[in-house]
Design a protein with these regions (language model features):
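Helix N-terminus capping/helix-initiation residues
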Residues: 30, 79-82, 154, 172, ...
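Structured loops at beta-to-helix junctions and adjacent beta-edge loops in soluble globular domains
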Residues: 55-56, 132-134, 144-146, 159, ...
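A surface-exposed partner-binding patch
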Residues: 1-136, 192-196, 210-229
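A short, hydrophobic/aromatic-rich structural module that often spans a beta strand
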Residues: 153-155, 185-190, 207-210
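Low-complexity, glycine/alanine/valine/leucine- and proline-rich hydrophobic stretches
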Residues: 139-166
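Secondary-structure transition/turn motif
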Residues: 157-164, 208-213, 222
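Compact, glycine/acidic-enriched structural inserts
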Residues: 163-187
């Protein structure tokens, strides 16, 4: 499977260039864990997503909007979510869709030029499955299993609290992994440190992946914009 070949290339690069991130990769997800996730979501995951999770089920330690573990992200500026955290993040948004003001929130959703008719102009959808997460904010890169009329099931999009305007990150997960591998080979995403406030109020420089003032969302949007303008 091409996705596994590309992901293996990325993991090899990670081992050689960002060892703190490599050491934070989690063991494989079991078939039972993957099946349970699909039942909970009510969607079948693309084979390439299952295959990658069956190699590394996210990270050993992970930072998300709900969890602070002072972890080195396994992706440039982003956390690689496990089956458990995919479910937890999806549940948070599923609960939001049950709130009385959901219609007002849905009206906040929009798409960038070039994504009209491909991604639904919503704030949230049960068919949006988070795979990669911002370590601090509830913002995600993930599967779109509920595309608009001209979209493709399994396309990769941005969504979340501050990502209410959507674009196509990649046509599928394999393509997203190839973008990831291409990006790290540019040298733009080195092993770095980030000044972080600890629970006792002190500050420390902790291992990080990518420039502290940059974000992988920007790289993905830059590629989308270049293709649509």
């Amino acid at each position: 499977m091409l996705a596994l070949e590309v992901f293996d290339g990325y993991v090899s690069w990670l081992r050689d260039n960002v060892p703190h991130a490599y050491e934070n990769l989690a063991p494989p997800a079991t078939p039972a864990e993957l099946d349970a996730l699909e039942r909970h979501l009510g969607y079948h995951l693309p084979a390439e997503v299952r295959a990658v999770l069956a190699v590394h089920n996210g990270q050993k330690s992970t930072d998300t909007a709900e969890h602070t573990e002072y972890a080195t992200p396994c992706l440039p500026t982003l956390s690689l979510l496990s089956t458990t955290l995919i479910r937890e993040c999806w549940d948070r948004w599923n609960a939001l869709r049950d709130t009385p003001d959901i219609e007002q929130l849905q009206d906040m959703g929009d798409v960038f030029p070039g994504a009209a008719g491909l991604v639904k102009p919503l704030y949230s959808s049960p068919g949006w499955i988070p795979l990669w997460s911002d370590p601090i904010n509830a913002d995600y890169i993930g599967l779109d299993l509920d595309p608009d009329v001209r979209g493709t099931t399994g396309q990769i999009i941005n969504f979340g609290r501050d990502e209410e305007r959507h674009f196509i990150c990649a046509p599928n997960y394999t393509s997203l992994l190839q973008i990831l591998l291409d990006e790290v080979h540019t040298g733009a995403w080195p092993a770095t440190e980030m000044e972080t406030e600890l629970p006792d109020g002190s500050w420390a420089d902790l291992p990080w992946f990518g420039a502290p003032d940059d974000h992988f969302f920007n790289a993905l949007y830059g590629r989308f914009k270049a293709q649509t303008t």
